[in-house]
Amino acid sequence: SFLWPLEEESVKLAHGVDADYALEDYASFTLRAYQIFELGDMVAIEKALGIKGHNAIHPCRRCTLKGVRNVEGGEKVYYIPLQLPHGHEPSGGERDPANLPLRIHEDFQEALDAMAQAKTKKEREAISKNTGIRQAPAFGRVGSIDYARSVPHDWMHLLLENIVPNLVMLWMGRYKGLDSGTEDYHIDDVVWAEIGKETVEATRHIPANFVRVLKDIAKDRSGFTAESWCFWFIYLAPILLRGRFKRKKYYKHMLSLVEIMKTSLKYSLTSEELDDLEVKIIDWVQKYER
């Protein structure tokens, strides 16, 4: 694995390497360094943590919530909604977004120990299925990584490569064949044609240092990078989508996500801002599921 050389170097740095510090006289000391965070897209992190990940019964790397699937529709993909479908009852407060059953570092080791002690392959697979943990995580030799807390969700992949493009597809009525159900958040194609033209015009005179030229979002999104989605959603969408939804609540919901994204991009956050951000994220997700 390409991670092996990095772990080898991490082991050496944990033991320490000789270094010199220049003041009036050179003074020798032992330099140590530890990796405490790891970032990557969803699939890469799932492999690094040794978890089953998306589509598993316990897909989340941060909590132990059990996924559900549309059995009647023949779906095999598990997902974790806060509002459970009919026929799925929560146990206790497991669906309380302000009090999720979070994983802790020890959960990983306990699951691995249980699998190691399993007497049969079937027993081992059952433990893996019920915990969502497949195998030992990477970077386990030094011990500086907390498997439950040191691997946060990557902002770019979570928002710009997932949530934002999917929202646009939902608003276009082109997301996996889903209609709007009892809601009415679809924006008509003729309106999207106008939005696409305005997107092109909006970036025509903006210096390239801020954003590259954007194509017609209604016709061609293949060239939209994470940077493109970020600029379009945070700076253009609040103007381009104003008055375009049939009901104002969808526009306000979009603005709430814009505010969340802007806040999370700040270089520093106070404890009060973090608490406020948590409340706003929970509110956004709950309104999305409605």
Region locations from a protein language model:
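General structural concept
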Residues: 1-7
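Charged, amphipathic alpha-helical oligomerization/scaffolding segments
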Residues: 5, 194, 198-201, 205, ...
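Charged (Asp/Glu and Lys/Arg) segments that form or flank catalytic channels of large polymer-
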Residues: 8-238
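Short, solvent-exposed secondary-structure capping/transition elements
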Residues: 15-19, 68-73, 244-253, 269-270, ...
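Short, hydrophobic/amphipathic alpha-helical patches that form generic packing surfaces
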Residues: 62, 231-242, 253-263
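Alpha-helical bundle/repeat cores within regulatory domains of eukaryotic proteins
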Residues: 248-290
